[in-house]
């Protein structure tokens, strides 16, 4: 190991231990002009902790300090290897293999382990105790009910309304932008007033507006990201979301229009934000499940940028035109018979 590698690894371990070690809730909180905890600003959740716990870890909610540091150093070494110049005469990668090298993957490469309440978490999910999503195996075929309905009835290209949310680059997942890190961007901006909280994710780039101390409409309809209302419980903002459009059912967290999501936002020590959510849907899950994610403030001067994705928008006109051509050919063939 070179001096640079040793130095970088040691620095990463120290920074990781410091940044993620203190997420206990505190009483001396920054407040807005209205007297509520101030969540405003730019946040990031750069860590390698997976949403679901590896099955071999069972009910182990946390790594030991030694295990966590070993994982951080391993990720640091991979990050350094990824940054090295590539051999122009190298063989092509094995079919289906993702190497995380610059020529085939530009996702973020986080190295930290998420830490909450002094624990290096093995997964974001903390309940059930095994850290896994409790899918109802009997109903797995219904987890993408919208997609399968279109496929089974040959409606996939009837019109733009029949397109999958991710296909049109509208919502590539998750249902709510802070629920788990989605490859390209773990960055979020929060803007807050007395009556509203706005959460803007960089990827996908959508503004979610939450009404505070309000109610869901008596007769509502499904919307992108659902309908969200919040209320204060001491220093915690509790947000309830319902009526999420069925086009937003993506793995690993599937949803229906009846899915309920309850989020809890609280400020922790050292300027951290503790984000917790619980997903409930008896149609899909054997029980509710809960995840916790620590966010830290982005460095001064860092902001988020619009992520523009057009593959499923401009190109979709061609997809529909091709489908209409196939329809016409089918009619010609039927007339010929």
Where is each model-derived feature located?
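Bacterial N-terminal signal peptides that target proteins for export
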Residues: 1-8
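Short, linear, compositionally biased motifs with a strong N-terminal bias
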Residues: 10-14
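N-terminal signal peptide c-region/cleavage motif recognized by signal peptidases
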Residues: 16-18
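PEST-like low-complexity, intrinsically disordered acidic/proline/serine-rich tracts
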Residues: 22-337
């Amino acid at each position: 190991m070179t001096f640079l590698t040793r130095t970088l690894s040691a620095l990463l371990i120290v920074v990781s231990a410091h940044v993620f070690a203190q997420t206990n809730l505190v009483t001396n909180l920054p407040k807005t002009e209205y007297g509520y905890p101030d969540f405003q600003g730019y946040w990031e959740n750069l860590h390698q902790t997976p949403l679901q716990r590896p099955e071999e870890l069972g009910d182990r909610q946390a790594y030991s300090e030694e295990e966590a540091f070993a994982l951080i150093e391993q990720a640091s070494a991979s990050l350094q290897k990824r940054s090295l110049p590539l051999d122009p005469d190298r063989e092509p990668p094995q079919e289906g293999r993702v190497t995380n090298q610059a020529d085939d993957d530009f996702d973020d490469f986080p190295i930290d382990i998420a830490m909450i309440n002094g624990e290096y978490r093995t997964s974001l999910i903390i309940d059930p105790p095994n850290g896994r999503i409790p899918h109802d195996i009997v109903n797995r075929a219904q987890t993408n009910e919208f997609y399968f309905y279109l496929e089974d009835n040959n409606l996939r290209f009837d019109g733009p309304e029949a397109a999958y949310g991710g296909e049109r680059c509208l919502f590539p997942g998750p249902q709510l932008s802070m629920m788990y890190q989605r490859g390209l961007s773990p960055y979020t901006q929060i803007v807050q007033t007395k009556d509203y909280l706005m959460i803007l994710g960089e990827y996908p780039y959508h503004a979610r507006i939450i009404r505070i101390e309000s109610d869901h409409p008596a007769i509502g309809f499904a919307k992108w990201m659902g309908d969200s209302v919040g209320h204060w419980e001491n220093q915690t903002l509790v947000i309830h979301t319902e009526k999420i459009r069925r086009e937003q059912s993506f793995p690993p967290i599937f949803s229906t229009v009846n899915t309920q999501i309850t989020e809890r936002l609280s400020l922790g020590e050292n300027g951290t934000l503790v984000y917790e959510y619980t997903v409930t849907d008896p149609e899909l899950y054997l029980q509710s499940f809960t995840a916790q994610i620590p966010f830290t403030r982005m460095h001064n001067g860092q902001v988020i940028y619009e992520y523009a994705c057009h593959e499923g928008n401009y190109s979709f006109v061609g997809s529909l035109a091709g489908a209409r051509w196939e329809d016409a050919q089918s009619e010609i063939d039927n007339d010929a018979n």
